[in-house]
């Protein structure tokens, strides 16, 4: 779910920030951040819980494979942790700047650094698809 959303944000949403007039931009950004949070936060929390639960419970993925020892599963979890780190260390601070003022450099950085999440979520989706395929036919 987040992979499709992040591609929309990367290709359509963030680039359009540059077209929002300076007048009214901060009000727009505050509203944007608030509304986006209500949509994205629950999905990200469920995704994180769904990734961590199999680790905590040491669930088997397939014969001889557990979530805690499977390199592909652990790599997918690693992608998710990097996504969270990028979100809170890069994108959230940039949104905070934009809530205070229209800043062309911050908009460019937001769009550029969001590629980190876009690529990681895409890689994670590919890993989970491979894992599902491997485990389904094991």
Task: Explain the meaning of each model-derived region.
Residues 1, 50, 72, 79-82, ...:
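Hydrophobic residues within membrane-embedded alpha-helical segments of Major Facilitator Superfamily
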Residues 40-54, 117-126:
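Core segments of transmembrane alpha-helices
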Residues 34, 38-41, 74-77, 111-118:
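Internal alpha-helical transmembrane segments of multi-pass membrane proteins, especially GPCRs
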Residues 1-46, 96-109:
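Interfacial loop at the N-terminal end of multi-pass membrane proteins
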Residues 81-89:
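Mid-bilayer segments of alpha-helical transmembrane spans in multi-pass integral membrane proteins
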Residues 53-80:
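Transmembrane helix-loop-helix
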Residues 128-138:
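Juxtamembrane boundary at the C-terminal end of a transmembrane helix
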């Amino acid at each position: 779910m987040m992979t499709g959303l992040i591609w929309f944000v990367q290709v359509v949403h963030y680039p359009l920030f540059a077209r929002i007039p300076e007048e009214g931009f901060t009000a727009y950004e505050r509203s944007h951040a608030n509304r986006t949070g209500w949509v994205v936060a629950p999905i990200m929390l469920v995704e994180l819980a769904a990734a961590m639960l199999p680790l905590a419970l040491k669930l088997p993925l397939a014969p001889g494979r557990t979530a805690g020892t499977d390199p592909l599963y652990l790599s997918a979890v690693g992608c998710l942790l990097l996504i969270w780190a990028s979100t809170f260390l890069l994108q959230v601070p940039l949104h905070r700047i934009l809530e205070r003022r229209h800043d062309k450099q911050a908009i460019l950085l937001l769009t550029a650094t969001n590629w980190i999440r876009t690529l990681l979520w895409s890689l994670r989706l590919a890993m989970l698809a491979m894992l599902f395929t491997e485990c389904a036919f094991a």
